[in-house]
Amino acid sequence: MSRYRGPRFKKIRRLGALPGLTSKRPRAGSDLRNQSRSGKKSQYRIRLEEKQKLRFHYGLTERQLLKYVRIAGKAKGSTGQVLLQLLEMRLDNILFRLGMALTIPQARQLVNHGHILVNGRIVDIPSYRCKPRDIITVKDEQNSRTLVQNLLDSSAPEELPNHLTLHTFQYEGLVNQIIDRKCVGLKINELLVVEYYSRQT
């Protein structure tokens, strides 16, 4: 299944706010109206919607998300929390959380076009897994820095999560540590996502 490229507002009206997909928000009460029209949701549908929320927020294909779930399932600790850590530490998401891009698809484009360096080397793989002490910088070229500066100026001021530091004037971000669960930028019940996949096998 390919990455979603359809109408974004349609998705947030059904699933709620997806800041990684779009900065738009559903109108207040739209969730309740949708729920009343569709009647009581089945447990399967609730799990499916949480999975879809995760997939659309981080801009993943079904195959990519399944791969992350399997990796998380083999790691120590809570599968759901490890899954969120894996997704949050992707380079495209780190750029988004730093405010260097307004959405994750926009961050993915920055990476694909070679504007971003990790520890002094160009990385053009959006799924690159960042680690503590990684230094993310914008390429020292005028078009790269002008592009990111415009995005920084356009992004709404938000408090950075504690696992990241941003040095705006140096066009540099630092990964301080693995993200804490409470700093994840999406309202999600990750256990329902894990349950969804465990019932598919």
Curated annotation (Swiss-Prot):
One Pfam family in the UniProt entry: S4
Keywords: Chloroplast, Plastid, Ribonucleoprotein, Ribosomal protein, RNA-binding, rRNA-binding
One GO location term (cellular component): small ribosomal subunit
InterPro entries from the UniProt entry: Ribosomal_uS4, Ribosomal_uS4_bac-type, Ribosomal_uS4_CS, Ribosomal_uS4_N, S4_RNA-bd, S4_RNA-bd_sf
Chain positions covered by the region annotation Disordered: 20-44
Subcellular location as annotated: Plastid, Chloroplast
Gene Ontology molecular function: any one: structural constituent of ribosome
The protein's assembly and partners: Part of the 30S ribosomal subunit. Contacts protein S5. The interaction surface between S4 and S5 is involved in control of translational fidelity.
PANTHER family on file: 30S 40S RIBOSOMAL PROTEIN, SMALL RIBOSOMAL SUBUNIT PROTEIN US4M
Protein name, entry field: Small ribosomal subunit protein uS4c
Recorded name of the encoding gene: rps4
